[in-house]
A protein has these predicted regions:
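Active-site-proximal cap/lid insertion segments
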Residues: 1-113, 122-130, 175, 179-183, ...
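Short, solvent-exposed turn/loop segments enriched in Gly/Ser/Thr/Pro and often Arg
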Residues: 65-71, 77-79, 132, 154-158, ...
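Secretory-pathway/luminal and periplasmic proteins that interact with or process carbohydrate-rich
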Residues: 71-74, 143-147
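Generic recognition of well-ordered alpha-helical segments
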Residues: 90, 111-122, 135, 139, ...
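Conserved hydrophobic/aromatic beta-strand scaffold that supports enzyme active sites
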Residues: 94, 163-165, 188
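WW-domain-binding short linear motifs
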Residues: 147-154
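Short, surface-exposed beta-strand/loop micro-motifs that present aromatic residues
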Residues: 162-167, 172-177
Length: 258
């Protein structure tokens, strides 16, 4: 939707063999490859499950499926992973095994660094003291909904500070300070009402005609709406506190350095 700050490397232009444009044909082709990858992963997991069954070890095995990041593939007019929208930031996390009720879903938040601790817990192994993650075992066994109520995200590609994001409950804030300060944006989303983080651009008549999707009025960036000034203030303060807690060396144009 706007040049969000990777001036030295636009993956769909500069990287040979990746993507040549954001045309409809390119997006359709890349989506087809994405779906093919998903189908292949499903087949490979199936082979593992069948092998465990034959070995008689399926009921004694924990299977964890996750990934390091997603990819836009046309969503928000982007092609790569250089963003903090849900399609690229949120990754799958599926677990099966002894003591984990099938068909259940937890709403809680976690980082990938929270995977090793529950693996140790479930296997009866002491968690190394150097590990910074939290154990998801109470969530996996249905004792808790979450171990974290706040998630923090950062992307520093291109000019600094780049992008930062924070999520709490249904609310999510994304800030951009890129392209040597020429792009400075703030986005606020209610993910319950706007799970795909749709923008005002998605409400354009030509976009609606092409996609067949008619977004609701609240499915936009709420940061510019005075009605949500309290939510914006709370999320801005939360983002700054997370940046300080994690010793982020950068600040955005409207944040104090203290």
């Amino acid at each position: 939707p706007f040049p969000d700050g990777h001036p030295g490397l636009r993956d769909e232009v500069r990287v040979p063999g990746v993507m040549t444009s954001r045309s409809e044909a390119t997006v359709r082709n890349e989506l087809g490859r994405e779906y093919a990858c998903i189908e292949n992963i499903d087949d490979q997991v199936g082979l593992v499950v069948e092998k465990l069954k034959k070995m008689g070890e399926l009921e004694n095995t924990y299977i964890i499926y996750t990934a390091d990041h997603g990819i836009a593939v046309g969503r928000h007019g982007l092609m790569g992973k250089q963003n903090l929208y849900e399609h690229s930031w949120r990754v799958p996390f599926i677990v099966s095994g002894p003591g984990i009720k099938s068909g259940t879903r937890a709403k809680g938040n976690n980082y990938l660094l929270d995977i090793l601790p529950p693996v140790c817990d479930l296997a009866g192994i002491a968690i190394p003291k150097t590990v910074q993650g939290k154990s998801l075992k109470p969530v996996l066994e249905g004792e808790k909904e979450q171990i974290r109520n706040v998630l923090y995200g950062a992307y520093c590609g291109g000019t600094k500070p780049g992008m930062r994001s924070v999520r709490k409950g249904d609310w999510k804030l994304i800030k951009y300070d890129t392209m040597d300060g020429t792009v400075r944006r703030t986005q606020l989303f209610n993910l319950k009402e706007n799970p795909h983080e749709l923008l005002i651009e998605h409400q354009a008549k030509d976009v609606i005609a092409k996609t067949g999707n008619s977004p609701r009025k609240k499915q936009v960036n709420l940061a510019v709406n005075p009605q949500y000034k309290d939510e914006l203030k709370e999320m801005e303060e939360l983002l700054l506190s997370e940046m300080k807690r994690l010793n982020d060396p950068y600040r955005f144009w409207d944040q104090p350095f203290k």
